[in-house]
Amino acid sequence: MASLKKSLFLVLFLGMVSLSICDKEKREGENEEEEEEHEEESEEKRGLLSFLPKVIGVIGHLIHPPS
């Protein structure tokens, strides 16, 4: 009976350790995905900011054409 308890506790302990490791890896993967999404968003913003002066220039020429 005592060896059965020890075996059961060992199995439960190893299960908890493996579950903990899996959760940690899952969180790390989620953090990496969030960082990639943030990088993509900042790249999109930079693209918009570089395009904005060109649009303003075209609108300015349409409103006040050069003489």
Curated annotation (Swiss-Prot):
Top-level taxonomic group: Eukaryota
Q: Which Pfam families match?
A: FSAP_sig_propep
What sections of the sequence does the record tag as coiled-coil?
Answer: none
Is Cell membrane included in the keywords of this UniProt record? no
Q: Which GO terms describe its cellular component?
A: extracellular region
Query: Keywords, A to Z?
Result: Amidation, Amphibian defense peptide, Antibiotic, Antimicrobial, Secreted, Signal
Chain residues in the propeptide: 23-46
Q: Name one GO biological process term.
A: defense response to bacterium
Signal peptide (UniProt feature, chain positions)? 1-22
* Location, primary (coarse class): secreted
UniProt lists compositionally biased (Acidic residues) regions at 30-42
How is expression of this protein distributed across tissues?
Expressed by the skin glands.
Segments carrying the region annotation (Disordered) are: 24-46
User: Tell me, what does this protein do in biology?
Assistant: Fallaxidin-4.1 shows antibacterial activity against the Gram-positive bacteria L.lactis (MIC=12 uM), M.luteus (MIC=100 uM), S.epidermidis (MIC=100 uM) and S.uberis (MIC=50 uM). No antibacterial activity against the Gram-positive bacteria B.cereus, E.faecalis, L.innocua, S.aureus, or the Gram-negative bacteria E.cloacae and E.coli. Inhibits the formation of NO by neuronal nitric oxide synthase with an IC(50) of 13.3 uM.
| Listed name of the protein | Preprofallaxidin-1
